[in-house]
């Protein structure tokens, strides 16, 4: 198959004419660290600004929804909140005073006699064991058992 006669003999004359210089390559354009830092800082600032813009947009949507809901579904405060100006500040509309409801009872007039004073009543209600067990089963542990109701005083 392949005998000794097929071996290659070196040609000394041909080797002398070939040059062994390395091929020249053009330098590849590489980005320096200086440009990478600028791009990173720019991307960070753009991300922060976009996040702030998104938060402002969500805030405006919530604010307009609350305003729309307040105009469409007015919450009527109780008679006590209509006549006590300190408590009416806790309502959603802080700037406008509440107009009295013509269908409600007139406010109690303050006495001009200095001897009379305001009296307060404190009441506690005791539930029977049967009802308290029923309430404990149906409600969670943080249930507030205090019930508030309007009390009308007549002379």
Curated annotation (Swiss-Prot):
It is a single-pass membrane protein. Keywords: Membrane, Phosphoprotein, Transmembrane, Transmembrane helix. The chain crosses the membrane at residues 41-61. This is Transmembrane protein C1orf162. Residues 1-28, 92-114 are annotated as: Disordered. One of its GO terms (cellular component) is membrane. Residues 19-28 have a biased composition (Low complexity). InterPro entries: C1orf162. The modification Phosphoserine is found at residue 140. It is found in: Membrane. It comes from Homo sapiens (Human).
């Amino acid at each position: 198959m392949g005998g000794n006669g097929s071996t290659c003999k070196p040609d000394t004359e041909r080797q002398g004419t070939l040059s062994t210089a390395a091929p020249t390559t053009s330098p590849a354009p590489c980005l320096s660290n200086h440009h990478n830092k600028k791009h990173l800082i720019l991307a960070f600032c753009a991300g922060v600004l976009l996040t702030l813009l998104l938060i402002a947009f969500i805030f405006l949507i919530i604010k307009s929804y609350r305003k729309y809901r307040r105009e469409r579904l007015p919450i009527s405060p109780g008679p006590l909140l209509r006549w006590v100006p300190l408590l009416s500040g806790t309502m959603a509309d802080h700037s406008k005073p509440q107009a009295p409801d013509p269908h409600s009872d007139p406010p109690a007039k303050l006495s001009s006699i200095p001897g009379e004073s305001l009296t307060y009543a404190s009441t506690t209600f005791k539930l029977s064991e049967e009802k308290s067990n029923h309430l404990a089963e149906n409600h969670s542990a943080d249930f507030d058992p205090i019930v508030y109701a309007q009390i009308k005083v007549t002379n």
